[in-house]
Amino acid sequence: MIASTESPRTNFSLSRGLLDVGIAVLAFVLVCAALNALLPFPEIDVVSAELRFFKEHRDEFDTVFIGSSRIHHQISPAIFDRVMGEAGHPTRTFNFGINGMFPPESGYVLERLLSTKPRLKWVFIELDELETRRIPKAEASRRSLYWHDWKRTSLVLRKILDGDDQRDARDLFFFHTALFAKNFANIGRKIDLSWWISHLGKKTAAPKSLGRDGDGYVPQIKTMSEAEAVAYEAGLKRAVVQAELRRVSPSTERAYRQWADDVRKAGATPIFLITPTRAQTKFEFRPESGVAGAVMPFNDAKGYPQLYRNEIRVDADHLNETGAEEFTRLIADTLSRLINDGRIQ
């Protein structure tokens, strides 16, 4: 029999080395987790300021719209409240739309908003697929980083892995994983602590992003040029022909189910809103999905032709001020009708 040449001391050293590495990794993870819990919310352009404003004024609102620029520039709280009041269902509305805020970032912000314990009645959430694409202009920004906690990142990674394009999937998988790692490791958080200390006890001014009435709505005045209108009409005709009813992806469904549950736990009713974009695909949830929320789809050029007139649009996806006012009235009328019919409460 040939005796082993590997000494017990070597085996012990290797095991001890692995143990030391494991302890170091565990310590790093625990420290990062502790810092995540203790550090103030990151100072993110527009987002942080509006969250602070909402927290300070949360008792003044019972209705919130949350989503992207298609909410920010297209929902007038003043008009919504007026129409709802005239219908016998008074509301006090805040527009929490932020340019470029798509799910799952919007879901993360919704959770932060609900954590302020507002007394809400209605929460409108823009309905769209989870955004997984890389946005070159924003890749290096803290805006891309701050919402990448494990809850959001796992949803994005699952959506990527469920996709068809494996080449893009590999790149996107590592991209979002890297953002999660940076966020978890608190990269760049020193600036947040410094900001928090320097503003401790100071009252901050209302952010300009809240618009002229301080309710979050910023209308757009622009109209399409003749050339833009021609291109828009041609694209809309194609979109109407290709219109379809499509179920959201499993990851998107999971995300919206959680958000709907969170809203209901907060004592409010969730409503999912599809804005009048040129894309005519109607999203829906599986009947057995368990998503507890009504869907209001307004991306229907045949059903709502008044929202697709050239003169009330900025581009294929956005309405100007005139269009936004008309859209807001339609939403309020629809909600009032659902309440009166007992189909929502």
PLM ranges: what are they?
Residues 1-16:
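N-terminal Lys/Arg-rich, disordered targeting/topogenic segments
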Residues 2, 140-258:
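Secreted/periplasmic serine-hydrolase-like ester/acetyl group-modifying domain
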Residues 16-37:
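Hydrophobic membrane-insertion alpha-helices, especially the h-region
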Residues 38-59:
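Alpha-helical transmembrane signal-anchor/signal-peptide segments
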Residues 64-67, 319:
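Short hydrophobic beta-strand that contains or immediately precedes a catalytic carboxylate
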Residues 66, 70-160:
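Membrane-embedded segments
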Residues 190, 257-283:
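Active-site segments of SGNH/GDSL-like serine hydrolases
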Residues 282-345:
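C-terminal regions of proteins
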